[in-house]
Swiss-Prot record:
One GO BP: DNA-templated transcription
Annotated cofactor note: Binds 1 Mg(2+) ion per subunit.
NCBIfam families: rpoC_TIGR
SUPFAM superfamilies associated with the record: beta and beta-prime subunits of DNA dependent RNA-polymerase
Role according to the record: DNA-dependent RNA polymerase catalyzes the transcription of DNA into RNA using the four ribonucleoside triphosphates as substrates.
Cofactor(s) required, per the database record: Mg(2+); Zn(2+)
Protein name listed in UniProt: DNA-directed RNA polymerase subunit beta'
Subunit architecture: The RNAP catalytic core consists of 2 alpha, 1 beta, 1 beta' and 1 omega subunit. When a sigma factor is associated with the core the holoenzyme is formed, which can initiate transcription.
Enzymatic reactions: RNA(n) + a ribonucleoside 5'-triphosphate = RNA(n+1) + diphosphate
Gene that encodes it: rpoC
GO molecular function terms listed in the Swiss-Prot or TrEMBL record: DNA binding; DNA-directed RNA polymerase activity; magnesium ion binding; zinc ion binding
Length: 1415
């Protein structure tokens, strides 16, 4: 940690200091003067003839130091021997020129000036301190109004504003000395310096206790916060007003002579000049006793000049330079992408680097790259020079330089020596995850392009269509070591996002391997038997046996005991060849490759080899199968011709059939049986099914096996092989080429009803082409926009997670989360074993129904244990998670589990936050770039039924069914579930039944897989009559709350509930349908005894007439759902962003806060009141307000459970956290984020999302401050909260009560403990203003802060080094203490007893060895 500040800028002579933290606070005028080396009195910069700086000007050499090293300005003293002499003629100290980068000056202001940051940055700090509004403050500061500072005995009040006339009148009325009023910054300064902070804090606390209402306490708390922060930090309020202005060193605002006698200067010099000019003029005016109005105007101008210097454009007009361009002020230097933080401190340029185009290098090994000789020569120059000198081939650097420039033969030999085993880093922009920079050993090549190994392309996301890559040379030994051990491409086989191999063959290689492992009937040599692989190779070479023939052969294998055995297999020569490359291992048997290998299978093979045979073997294996894949693809000669796209003969019959269907729907619509919306949905559905059907026919045709005359199997269709192997192309693209193009989407995302029936092979008609251009254009536009959005999301994620590092091995927490298989629409999308892989078990995992332990508590679940869990049919597993980790800073290794990129338990010092951010952000860009591949084809079609995904017995939970007139079972309950139970009594699947669904099975019935369980209408929500009777309309008045929609096309009318609140008469209506008893004429009552009534929501379609007889189970009304929109990652990226930003959705769901019964209370103007009466008497009932006209799915008297939705919609994550706790929130977030990525087929491990959610949950909101210093509504860290509460409990005071809150990633980043990190993220000025008022200390624990101050990051090797240094330092300290104790005891023995001689400070030489040892 103890890093050295090379020279202390404020005092270069002082010894080098080490620091552990950085504090930011307000500078007092005395502090500014102590930094300064002199006052700047003139606005001049340099003399235009001599180019020497003017004395007392902005570049004065007397104040800031000499212009040339060790030479005074007039040239009287030169060279080192006069170091430190001050020249008596020109007053310049003889020293290094670089002090001009460090020495500051100052300007004595003739009138105080307010610091604009503390005035205008919201909330205004000066305003809060004085309890004045910003508008009033500006009036005083810019000399419009007077303010009363000391009212005396008059009836004016403190802080009252007066205009000039009022002020003069008051002076006449009360006399000039009766009260004090003032104007300008002086007045504000007087008021600020008069504040007694402790007294104010006391008063505010008292007021807070008595304050009631909503706004008053908030306001008091705000003021109290700022007063407390001034007290704690030791700042004084009046320091927010400047009396002395610091001037930054001249080298930091340089003036550079251009050719032609002109100068380029930093804008700051202009801004400083304006300040000095106005300040000098003001001084002169005051001396001359100028009229008040003139002086006041000059003061106002001075204030404006200083404002512009600090933050140009924050107030008033922007000050522009000569070319109408706004001048860059001090704030602009820090802000934004081009500011100091992001441009220079976080984004430095690198020396020893070069870039060039990349080409493929298939003959390279995985750890190599081809480096052009020209580049290598340039990059390794210093190494070559030193080697040339060492060999005696040159005596000076100059000579060596000449040799290299001439490119003599010996230079090349030396270059070879230098480069041997010296890794270089290759990087491809955009570097979206850590695999975008990898280390390789360079191989010198002719030519000018870098050669890249084909297998690492997917990690870099590189292709060879003109991509460029950058090369960097690690110079120091440590850097070379890290490059080799951590970043070598061979050490990065697995992806950190999901733990799957990322070094995977693609395209040609996959095609070659697919072709190699094909098996065809009736080929030459079928049925032959071979004794060894060599024999097979011989037969292949001789042409006696075909690559794809079925043969029998023996091959060496390892059995489970580890002995070599020879086994016989029925296989093909191609597979045998591949099997011969497999490392010999019991876990990698020949069966692994004895099948048709598609891309996924190849990935599995590599994964298996990596897991069981070690890294070295797997890397060699990868290289070999790459070579084999390329070779075989080339030999196979698989090509692509237009005739390979087959159009099925059945296409037109299918299309015509659907055309007739669509005509029928049109007719139904004309007859008024269905609405426009329903017709649209049905048509779109029919066409999307038709398009799928045609595609299916095409695939069947193209994949059909054909035989030649001899009965031998023909080679499959080459396009089919490309797509089926996973090399290139997808069924969706083949469908467009050979099936029908399908439905298209409009630019706004709606699906056009008429599909494109032609495919590309047949050609499109003009209209079809026009329709298809929408999709294409939308795709391109989307791509451009999304790249930016995705990059910004990654940046926010990195910022929120950057200080999440593995800091300890085990935090010892008892908390955990429950993992279960992810199920989507009753289909298991990721099994339990996949979700718990690489996690640590929090409890013993038992075989269900027994006491047999599968995985013990605290064990890491690896592949083997995960398989055991699967075999045991465990349904739920408690696992440790970063969310519940209780480590002080960062997380612990046990809670995090396996490091996905290494396959072992994570190391201490791993920056898991950054890895999580990259893993989530990287696919964002990938996905966004992949929107347009399918060309905007709509994947329409809504699911409307559910089939059993497994065999088992049906079990209903909370059943509530009603049989309608047709004998169908209709679901009437809100929380009914249907579960499928297997023989062992384990629950295999549960489905939530929506209200109004038809159930096709009975309770306890056994079902086979594929049985239809229930169906529902995907387009409308029905409202169903519970009992039979007569329907009676209430408040459904035509023209007010009901509109009759007459369809022009059909002439049929429909009654639709319209928004009655918008009509003048409709304010108090409550439109509903009541079911009446036809005999008595009273409303029918349900089981709870309430009258059966159905409130209508806006846009509901009425299905019954007033007075019509209805039967139980009939539909009374239908509420339309949203139309089918296309699912595109467009929904995806913004969705992920809004989840991580924790935004409340527009119409968010209302979640029940506790178990209870629903009651409808008295209505407001346009809201309905729903109350939940809790079952538990101790709890209070909770009220919700719902806008009238919204559909409420619960009835009076319904029982709801905690967490049920009272109103449909997307839930707000804050509500989930508040009501159901952290684990429910985590599950919600993980499921929602994974949903988006899964749609794109991207796998991301859950733990990355958990790490980000953990960072969002770091703060607690104080609900009740108790007797602590914490304030209600304040956000504090858990550590801070615990500390404060412990103190309070020790002193017998009431502790504060708080609850965890969820912050969006932007908010969480801005509220981190480190102000340096927050300032470099966003809103720089606001963050720095706040931090300086509070006197914040940055402990430098995160990554960003350390990079900014120029240290190694406290993660990885940097963390290890600092840890070692700390241990060494502690040991030194103990040694020193021991020596000191020894010396003291010896001294005590030697000293005479009666009078102890005080040797004074001279004797301290023995003890103080600290200085000499401290590094």
């Amino acid at each position: 940690m103890n890093q050295e500040l090379s020279t202390n800028p404020f005092n270069p002579v002082a010894p080098v200091k080490t620091f552990d933290e950085i504090k930011i606070s307000l500078a007092s005028p005395e502090r500014i003067l102590s930094w300064s080396y002199g006052e700047i009195k003139k606005p001049e910069t340099i003399n235009y003839r001599t180019f020497k700086p003017e004395r007392d000007g902005l570049f004065c050499a007397r104040i800031f130091g000499p212009i040339k090293d060790y030479e005074c300005l007039c040239g009287k003293y030169k060279r080192m021997k006069y170091r430190g002499v001050v020249c008596e003629k020109c007053g310049v100290e003889v020293t290094l020129q670089k002090v001009r980068r460090e020495r500051m000056g100052h300007i004595e202001l003739a009138a105080p000036v307010a610091h604009i940051w503390f005035l205008k940055s919201l909330p205004s700090r000066i305003g809060l301190m004085l309890d004045m509004t910003l508008r009033d403050l500006e009036r005083i500061l810019y000399f419009e109004n007077y303010v009363v500072i000391e009212p005396g005995l008059t009836d004016l009040t403190y802080g009252q504003l007066m205009t000039e006339e009022e002020f003069l009148d008051a002076q006449d009325q009360y006399g000039a000395d009766a009260f004090t009023a003032n104007i300008g910054a002086e007045a504000i300064r007087e008021m600020l310096s008069a504040i007694d902070l402790e007294q104010t804090a006391e008063t505010l606390r008292e007021e807070l206790k008595e304050a009631t209402g909503e706004l008053k306490p908030k306001k008091i708390i705000k003021r109290l916060k700022i007063v407390e922060s001034f007290l704690e930090s030791g700042n004084r309020p009046e320091w927010m007003i400047l009396t002395v202005l610091p001037v930054i060193p001249p080298e930091l605002r340089p003036l550079v002579p251009l050719d032609g006698g002109r100068f380029a200067t930093s804008d700051l010099n202009d801004l400083y000049r304006r300040v000095i000019n106005r300040n000098n003029r003001l001084k002169r005016l005051i001396e001359l006793r100028a009229p008040d109005i003139i002086v006041r105007n000059e003061k106002r101008m001075l204030q404006e000049a200083v404002d512009a210097l600090f933050d140009n454009g924050r107030r008033g007009r922007v000050i522009t330079g000569t070319n109408k361009r706004p001048l860059k002020s001090l704030s602009d230097m820090l802000k934004g992408k081009q500011g100091r933080f992001r441009q220079n401190l976080l984004g430095k340029r690198v020396d020893f680097s070069g870039r060039s185009v990349i080409v493929t290098g298939p003959e390279l090994k995985l750890h190599q790259c081809g480096l052009p000789k020209k580049m290598a020569l340039e990059l390794f120059k210093p190494f070559i020079y030193s080697r040339l000198e060492a060999k005696g081939l040159s005596s000076t650097v100059k000579q060596a330089k000449k040799l290299v420039e001439k490119e003599r033969p010996e230079v090349w030999d030396i270059l070879d020596e230098v480069i041997r085993e010296h890794p270089v880093l290759l990087n491809r922009a955009p570097t979206l995850h850590r695999l975008g920079i990898q280390a390789f050993e360079p191989i010198l090549i002719e030519g000018k392009a870098i050669q890249l190994h084909p297998l690492v392309c997917s990690a870099f996301n590189a292709d060879f269509d003109g991509d460029q890559m950058a090369v960097h040379v690690p110079l120091s030994l440590e850097a070379q070591l890290e490059a080799r051990v951590l970043m070598m491409s061979t050490n990065n086989v697995l992806s950190p996002a999901n733990g799957a191999p990322i070094i995977v063959p693609s395209q040609d290689m996959v095609l070659g391997l697919y072709y190699t492992t094909m098996e065809r009937r009736g080929m030459k040599g079928e049925g032959m038997a071979f004794s060894s692989v060599e024999e097979v190779e011989h037969a292949l070479a001789a042409g006696e046996v075909h690559l794809h023939a079925t043969i029998t052969a023996r091959i060496k294998q390892i059995d489970d005991e580890g002995n070599e055995v020879v086994k016989r297999y029925q296989t093909t020569p191609g597979r045998l060849r591949l099997g011969n490359l497999l490392p010999l291992n019991a876990k990698a048997p020949f069966e692994l490759v004895n099948r048709l290998l598609r891309k996924k299978d190849v990935q599995n093979v590599i994964d298996t080899v990596y897991r069981y045979c070690g890294q070295k073997e797997s890397v060699i294996f990868c290289d070999q199968i790459m070579g084999m894949g390329f070779r075989e693809a080339f030999k196979a000669g698989i090509s692509f011709g237009k005739d390979d796209m087959l159009i099925p003969d059945t296409k037109w019959p299918i299309v015509n059939e659907v055309r007739d269907q669509v005509k029928e729907f049109e007719q139904q619509y004309m007859d008024g049986l269905i609405t426009q919306g329903e017709k649209y949905n049905k048509v779109v559905d029919a066409w999307s099914k038709c398009s799928d059907k045609v595609a299916g026919e095409m695939m069947a045709e193209i994949s059909a096996v054909r035989y030649d005359d001899a009965g031998a199997e023909k080679e499959p269709n080459s396009v089919y092989m490309m797509s089926h192997s996973g090399a290139r192309g997808s069924p969706a693209q083949m469908k467009q080429l050979g099936g029908m193009r399908g439905l298209m989407a409009k630019p706004n995302g709606e699906i056009i009803e008429t599909p494109i029936i032609s495919n590309f092979k047949e050609g499109l008609t003009v209209l079809e082409y026009f329709n298809s251009t929408h999709g294409a254009r939308k795709g391109l536009a989307d791509t451009a926009l999304k790249t930016a959005n995705s990059g910004y999301l990654t940046r926010r994620l990195v910022d929120v997670a950057q200080d999440c590092i593995v800091r300890s091995h085990d935090c010892g927490t008892e908390n955990a989360i429950t993992a279960s298989a992810a199920v989507n629409d009753g289909e298991v999308v990721s099994p339990l074993s996949e979700r718990v892989l690489g996690r640590v078990a929090a409890e013993d995992i038992l075989v269900p129904g027994t006491d047999e332990v599968v995985v013990a508590r605290g064990e890491l679940i690896d592949e083997r244990r995960a398989d055991l869990i699967d075999q045991a049919n465990v349904a739920l597993v408690r696992i440790r998670s970063p969310l519940t980790c209780e480590a002080e800073e960062g997380v612990c290794a046990m809670c995090y589990g396996r490091d996905l990129a290494r396959g072992t338990l994570v190391n201490i010092g791993e920056a898991v936050g950054i890895i999580a951010a990259q893993s989530i952000g990287e696919p964002g860009t990938q996905l966004t770039m992949r929107t347009f591949h399918i060309g905007g084809i709509a994947q329409g079609g809504q699911q409307s039924f559910l089939e059993a995904s497994q065999e088992g017995r049906i079990e209903f939970r909370n059943p509530n069914l009603l049989e309608n007139a047709n004998g169908e079972q209709i679901v009437m309950g809100r929380n009914m579930q249907l579960a499928i139970i297997d023989e062992a009594g384990q629950e295999r699947a549960t489905h939530k039944l929506t209200y109004g669904a038809k159930v096709h099975v009975k309770d306890g019935q056994s079902v086979k897989r594929g049985t239809r369980l229930f169906e529902w209408d995907p387009y409308t929500l029905p409202i169903i009559a519970e009992k039979g009777g007569v329907a009676r309309f209430v408040d459904l008045v035509s023209g007010i709350s009901v509109r009759e929609d007459t369809d022009e096309a059909t002439g049929m009318t429909q009654k639709i509930v319209s928004d009655w609140r918008s009509t003048p008469k409709g304010g108090d209506l409550k439109p509903e349908i009541i079911i009446m008893d036809p005999d008595t004429g009273n409303p029918m009552r349900n089981e709870a005894g309430n009258p059966i009534s159905y409130p209508m929501s806006v846009e509901a379609i009425l299905s019954v007439e007033d007075g019509q007889t209805v039967r139980a189970g009939d539909v009374v009304a239908r509420i339309p759902r949203e139309g089918a929109r296309t699912k595109d990652i467009t929904g995806g990226l913004p969705r992920v962003a809004e989840l991580f930003e924790a935004r409340r959705p527009k119409d968010h769901a209302i979640i029940a806060e506790n178990d209870g019964y629903v009651r409808f209370g008295k209505d407001y103007k346009n809201k309905r009141r729903i109350t939940i009466e809790p079952v538990d008497e101790t709890l209070n009932s909770v009220e919700y307000m719902v806008p009238k006209g919204k559909h409420i799915p619960v009835q009076e008297g319904d029982f709801v459970q905690k967490g049920d939705y009272i109103m449909d919609g997307n839930p707000a994550p804050h509500d989930i956290l508040r009501i159901m706790g952290v684990e429910a929130l985590a599950n919600y977030m993980i499921d929602e984020v994974q949903e988006v990525y899964r749609l794109q087929g991207v796998k991301i491990n859950d733990k990355h999302i958990e790490v980000i959610v953990r960072q969002m949950l770091q703060k607690y909101e104080i609900l009740d401050s108790g007797e602590t210093t914490l304030l209600k509504g304040e956000h504090v860290d858990k550590a801070e909260l615990d500390e404060t509460n412990e103190k309070a409990i020790q002193h017998g005071m009431r502790p504060a009560h708080a609850e965890p809150i969820l912050l969006g990633i932007t908010k969480a980043s801005l509220q981190t403990r480190s102000f340096i990190s927050a300032a470099s993220f966003q809103e720089t000025t606001r963050v720095l203003t706040e931090a300086s008022v509070q006197g914040k200390r940055d402990k430098l624990v995160g990554l960003k802060e350390n990079v900014i101050v120029g240290r190694l990051i406290p993660a990885g090797t940097g963390g290890a080094t600092s840890r070692v240094k700390k241990i060494a330092h502690d040991r030194d300290q103990t040694v020193i203490d021991a020596r000191r104790a020894e010396a003291e005891s010896a001294a005590a023995l030697a000293a005479p007893t009666d009078e102890v001689i005080d040797l004074g400070p001279e004797d301290s030489g023995l003890v103080e060895t600290v200085e000499s040892r401290k590094e």
